[in-house]
Regions:
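Peripheral interaction segments used for macromolecular assembly
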Residues: 1-120
Length: 120
């Protein structure tokens, strides 16, 4: 994941051996907003599921998984959303994007252009 912008991961397909299971719709970060812990994936059946970062491999054109069982149900997604933050929430507050290091750590916070906050 070295040097990837968070927004570049949004809408990226999640695939198992070339079969699309869903698309990334948000990044889930720890409570401090310093490390990505996983992804909110909108699956083909219309259900949002949690994909832990440790079970995912970011590739140039997809997020690859080794098993469909890596996509956890809505209860786990809610658990991580409630105890952490999301890229969408950070973008509402003060940021335009984040740049991620190889282990999912936030290496850089990209401020909103002009420093404007929502509603300004």
């Amino acid at each position: 994941m070295r040097g990837l912008h968070g927004q570049d991961l949004l809408r990226r397909p999640v695939r198992l051996r070339g079969i699309q299971l869903g698309r990334v719709v948000d990044l889930i970060l720890d409570a401090a907003g310093t490390r990505v812990v996983g992804f909110d994936v909108l699956c083909g059946d219309g259900t949002h599921r949690f994909l832990p970062l440790s079970a995912a491999e970011a590739q140039p054109d997809q997020i690859a998984v080794r098993s469909a069982l890596s996509l956890l149900d809505a209860a786990e997604l809610t658990f991580y959303q409630e105890r952490g933050t999301t890229l969408a929430a950070l973008r509402l507050e003060e940021l335009d994007d984040v740049v991620l290091g190889a282990g999912g750590e936030v290496r850089e916070r990209v401020p909103r252009a002009g420093g404007d906050s929502p509603g300004s």
